[in-house]
């Protein structure tokens, strides 16, 4: 699976969808390569956030996409300038290339949404 996009646009989109994740949430972003775009989405107890950016030279991946730790992606994209290529193998291993630099990110399991249980207060009699 493959796509090319602008590194700054991808970084900004990643920051946007991850903006709703709180420190206690499972830090996970789902990336999917579509016919002409790259889709990004996150899920948490607060809800679901998603966006997409234009991409070229795409070879789409399965509809389910692949999951990654967002901070690893942001660390690389913060320093990248211009076009970045994303190559994903069948197991989800992601290779990002920009500015003659390469960065590999391993996939992770799907997000586990944390639910907060309200404590019951016992009445003192």
Where do the model's predicted regions map?
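DNA polymerase processivity clamps
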Residues: 1-125
């Amino acid at each position: 699976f493959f796509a090319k996009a602008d590194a700054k646009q991808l970084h900004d989109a990643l920051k946007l969808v991850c903006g709703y994740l709180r420190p206690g949430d499972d830090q996970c972003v789902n990336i999917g390569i579509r016919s002409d775009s790259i889709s990004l989405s996150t899920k948490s107890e607060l809800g679901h956030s998603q966006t997409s950016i234009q991409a070229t030279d795409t070879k789409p991946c399965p509809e389910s996409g692949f999951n990654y730790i967002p901070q690893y992606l942001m660390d690389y994209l913060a320093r990248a300038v211009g076009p970045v290529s994303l190559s994903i193998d069948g197991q989800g291993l992601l290779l990002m290339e920009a500015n003659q630099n390469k960065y590999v990110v391993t996939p992770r399991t799907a997000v586990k949404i944390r639910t907060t249980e309200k404590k019951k207060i016992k009445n003192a009699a």
